[in-house]
Amino acid sequence: MIPGMGMNPKQLKQMQRAMKQMGMDMKDLRGVEEVVIKLKKKEIIIKNPRVNVMDFMGQKTYQVTGKARECDLEAEVKIPDDDIELVMNQTGVSREEATRALQETGGDLAEAIMRLS
């Protein structure tokens, strides 16, 4: 249920009954190996999380607890020199502009060329 509440089992049962009467239902989601939250420029990865699902009047809310690790997506993109040269030749831009466009598009050659043309 809700970790760290410091309730004895009787209080917990009473709270669960009260939640049920208000139309709230809370369950553990079992077997979750990983939760990934994708943002524009990074990902938050939670391995072996504890996930609770609360259903209140048809609206589901997920509570995720665990140790999170952040990955910067921009830092992970490795752009080959051949790709940079191709974008430079196709668009006539500088090496820095071609590299920036490729990083912004995640290494997508066609998208980088279209953005610079």
From Swiss-Prot:
| Gene Ontology molecular function: any one | RNA binding
Cellular component per GO?
nascent polypeptide-associated complex
Residue intervals of the NAC-A/B domain: 9-77
What InterPro entries does its record include? Answer: EGD2/NACA0like, NAC-like_UBA, NAC_A/B_dom_sf, NAC_arc, Nas_poly-pep-assoc_cplx_dom, UBA-like_sf
Q: Which UniProt keywords apply?
A: Protein transport, RNA-binding, Transport
Q: Which domain of life is it from?
A: Archaea
Q: Which Pfam families match?
A: NAC, UBA_HYPK
Q: For this chain's UniProt record, which GO biological process terms are given? A: protein transport
Record-stated family: Belongs to the NAC-alpha family.
> How does this chain assemble?
Homodimer. Interacts with the ribosome. Binds ribosomal RNA.
Please give the function described in this protein's UniProt entry: Contacts the emerging nascent chain on the ribosome.
- HAMAP family reported for this sequence: NAC_arch (MF_00814)
**NCBIfam families given in the database record:** archaeal-type nascent polypeptide-associated complex protein (TIGR00264)
Name of this protein: Nascent polypeptide-associated complex protein
Q: What is the organism field in this record?
A: Methanothermobacter marburgensis (strain ATCC BAA-927 / DSM 2133 / JCM 14651 / NBRC 100331 / OCM 82 / Marburg)
